[in-house]
Each structure stands twice: as C-alpha cells, then as structure tokens.
C-alpha cells in the first residue's frame, strides 16, 4: 500500500514522501514488479520492506511546491525539482503513471507565475483534460474513423469536444461516458 505524504511545518519547509511499504525484493530476479506476480515461484517471495532511506522523498524543492494527484513520485515538484526514476531500482516496482488530474496539476502548477489562493483554487477545480495517453489514443482513433450517418454525427460531436468536463459543452456527457472505460483500463494496466 502507498500513502503518498505531503507535509509542511511551521518553518515553511515542505516535503513529499512516497510513504510505501515496498517489499525488499532481490535485485537479481527478473519479474514485472509492477504487475501481478505468479504464486508458484519461490524466488519471488520477499521478507520485509525496503529501508525508509530507499523510498522516494523530496524536501524543499526549488520549485517551491509539491503536489499529489495519484501521480508517480517522479512528477511531484516541477521539471527542475523532480526526482529522477533512474535514481531508484526498478525492483521497487514504483508506478510510472499519470492520471489526467495529475497531468493538469503538474502543468498548471508549472505554468503559474504566482501560487496564491486564487491560483490554487483554479488549479484544484480545473476540469480540463490533456490530450495524452488514453485521451490521445481515443481521439487519434476517432480522427481516423471513417463513418456515415449517425455514427459520423457522434464521431464529429466527440471530435468537437472542448476538452473540458464542465457540463457546458454539447459533447461533455458522451465524451465522459466514452473515456471512462479507457481511463479505468489505463489505470489498471489493462489498456491494449
């Protein structure tokens, strides 16, 4: 289990800790540590967790901010402040995913000139999607789809989506129904 921790103290120090109980796995065993492992291999059995010193953590990044929106720990503080995945063993099995919410938070925090209360509220309540991962795959597929009649109308409605889920666009409901399963499959490593 992972409880990603963000904290600030009275002195204004900020920190991000990938507060996971990561199994202490053998480095020399080949396995997909991010997936479901077979139960018939004794070399996959582990005993105990890695030391706290080995898990990703960040204190007082130069960006001046940290965030968490179910993102990988390598995108928590901005381009020049983020941890590098190369600094951590792949055996740790740390996820390498971004949710749309994490992509948007990262983008908006990185672009903000001032992170005051108003800016943070705009970022928190942002309803825009990034054309990345499952959204990009779906839209690229729609653009290639040859269709006629009602199917063409539905395709064109989707392609005209304003890429926000604010319940104001004509395509919002259909789009969100369409991307829901793609989003779930992507997050659960079931996307093909």
Predicted regions: what is each one?
Residues 7-192:
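Long, compositionally biased non-active-site segments enriched in small/hydrophobic residues and glycine
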């Amino acid at each position: 289990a992972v409880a990603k921790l963000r904290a600030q103290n009275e002195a204004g120090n900020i920190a991000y800790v990938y507060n996971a109980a990561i199994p202490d796995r053998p480095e020399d065993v080949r396995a997909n540590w991010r997936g479901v492992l077979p139960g018939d291999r004794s070399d996959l059995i582990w005993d105990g967790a890695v030391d706290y010193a080995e898990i990703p953590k960040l204190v007082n990044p130069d960006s001046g901010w940290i965030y968490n929106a179910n993102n990988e720990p390598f995108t928590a503080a901005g381009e020049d402040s983020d941890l590098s995945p190369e600094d951590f063993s792949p055996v740790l099995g740390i996820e390498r995913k971004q949710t749309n919410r994490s992509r948007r938070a990262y983008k908006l925090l990185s672009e903000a000139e001032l992170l005051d209360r108003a800016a943070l509220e705009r970022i928190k309540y942002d309803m825009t999607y990034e054309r990345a991962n499952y959204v990009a795959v779906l839209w690229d597929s729609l653009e290639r789809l040859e269709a006629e009649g009602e199917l063409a109308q539905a395709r064109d409605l989707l392609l005209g989506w304003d890429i926000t889920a604010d319940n104001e666009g004509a395509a919002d409901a259909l789009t969100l129904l369409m991307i829901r399963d793609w989003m779930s499959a992507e997050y659960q490593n079931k996307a093909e």
